[in-house]
């Protein structure tokens, strides 16, 4: 019998596996083609140099694949470190940093002047074209002051606590993002906003990401965290929730602590027009790609 395969190279299983993965990603790329995906970047992923470089490459890949990624970043630990270096004591209430005039200036410096530019540089180094913004640029995030309700045990009544220059989005003006996206540039946004009377406000990054995702009609909002996602009473990951189910879990006490404001952001975003939100484990390598381009996912998906 003649050797018809003479000279043929044996198949490399690892190369075939890579080809299969790329092929399986095609329908997901088609689903998100020219769609906006907002990624809130923070936590361990942002503090780890290797994960940070991988994150930048993944975001550039999204852009090359036809998606329109928008990155919104946090920076709480870096702000705390700078305040400590300057001898300024940090105070918190309900997870929010009480922010006086001196503190908000440092917050803006760290978020918009340091962290933002580092992320932009990483994206550009990975072969992308990125530009850094904060909510003050183009009046992107118009902010209003936040007052926090606290229970006074002596009078047994709720009082309003003045958090200083801590705000929340009142309005998003997305025109500047439309212009940037049409130029094939990746916007990187620091969560600093400006009030109608010109004051600068420190805003929670999850909240800013959610408001921008709703204003842009995003297909997905991804919140990178340092946890696996939303956990049930048995401690196991809940892979998917409807808005109604998420509200029920908060009401019955299954969800507590820092996960509550994240779920509230998810709910508001979905009700505001975002197709789905994912609380994503940012410690997982290539978590963004796994979530968008495979059936695997890496967290909890919330949708209507």
Curated annotation (Swiss-Prot):
Gene3D superfamilies registered for this protein in UniProt: Acetylglutamate kinase-like
Site for Transition state stabilizer, residues: 40, 262
Give the binding site residues for substrate. Answer: 75-76, 97, 202
| Sequence similarity | Belongs to the acetylglutamate kinase family. ArgB subfamily.
Q: Which NCBIfam families match?
A: argB
This chain's function reads: Catalyzes the ATP-dependent phosphorylation of N-acetyl-L-glutamate.
Which protein is depicted?
Acetylglutamate kinase
Source organism of the structure: Parvibaculum lavamentivorans (strain DS-1 / DSM 13023 / NCIMB 13966)
Origin organism lineage? Bacteria, Pseudomonadati, Pseudomonadota, Alphaproteobacteria, Hyphomicrobiales
